[in-house]
Amino acid sequence: MTGGSGAVAGGVSGGTATVALSLASAAIWGTSDFVGGIAARRLPSSAVVTLSHSLSLAMLVSLALLHRSTWPDTPSVIYGALAGLACGTGVMVLYKALSLGGMGLTAAVSGVLAAVLPVLWAFVTEGLPRVPQIAGIVLAAVAIWMIGRAPGSPSSKQAILLGAAAGGSFGCLFILLKLAGRGGVLWPLAWSRLASATLAVIVTWIATRRAGGVKRDATPMLSWPGWPVLGLIAIAGIFDASGNTFYTIATRLGRLDIAAVLSSLYPASTILLAAVLLKERTTRSQAAGMALALVAVVLISA
């Protein structure tokens, strides 16, 4: 293991900002997933990602130009593009799961796996954090499972595979955004969005061909979704890109494991929005998980 006490000290520096930005990214990502999941009930998930990520790409490029951000080095561009592929894969799988009417086991598996991968990476590359932070990370992982897992969720092989695919993709995304962020924020994120949008276009094209082309009565792949759905897609794209921005800044200021674990609490805001707007019932396990998440945040911030 590398880093030792120096890594621990580095984790304390900027710790408050890292916690705040990571929690903000979790809230924003959860909102994006909620809105995107609703849109994915009207359009294929790949089409939702194509439109939302294309819009957010334009937003990121515009912000980078207005901010006169420095062009990133080659490694940051490569890491950013790889992060985009991971993001595009994870979001399409997650939107597909959400469009089926609930998160259940898929959300629980994806949330925990998304947090575990960057935590292990950080332990190797940055050294162990302080004891209270380790305890907070463990509690946060348990909270993520409790929040995402709902009683009665089908424990099918498909649910587990979808959860593992989404979680593995998001875990890689967390690591790659940390690496890409060394060369800046906006331009690496723009490259990430370009890669994810391109991947979604390819997936949409393949799915359309398999469906027999663009036929009004056969596939909704490229049909007009209506302004309300487009509005939801726009919100999903803007919020997702904003969450990526906050998370990347958080990793620049503090430890990867702390940023990733706290950001992985995104299902909480999705469930809260579903409870308020869709009147979906929050279980006792989910409520306990949210309370446990608060304890984890306190320990991590200590």
Each model region followed by its residue ranges:
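Hydrophobic transmembrane alpha-helices of multi-pass small-molecule transport proteins
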Residues: 55, 60, 116-120, 129-149, ...
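Membrane-interface interhelical linkers
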Residues: 2-27, 35-36, 40-46, 51-81, ...
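Residue positions within transmembrane alpha-helices of multi-pass solute transporters
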Residues: 27, 31, 62, 89, ...
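Selected transmembrane alpha-helices and immediately adjacent juxtamembrane segments
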Residues: 158-186, 228-229
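Alpha-helical transmembrane segments of compact multi-pass small-molecule transporters, enriched
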Residues: 54-60, 109-123, 195-199, 243-246, ...
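Hydrophobic/aromatic positions within or immediately flanking transmembrane alpha-helices
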Residues: 22, 46-50, 80, 104-108, ...
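Hydrophobic/aromatic residues within transmembrane alpha-helices
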Residues: 39, 48, 97, 123-129, ...
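Alpha-helical transmembrane segments and their membrane-interface exit regions
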Residues: 85-90, 138-149, 195-203, 267-271
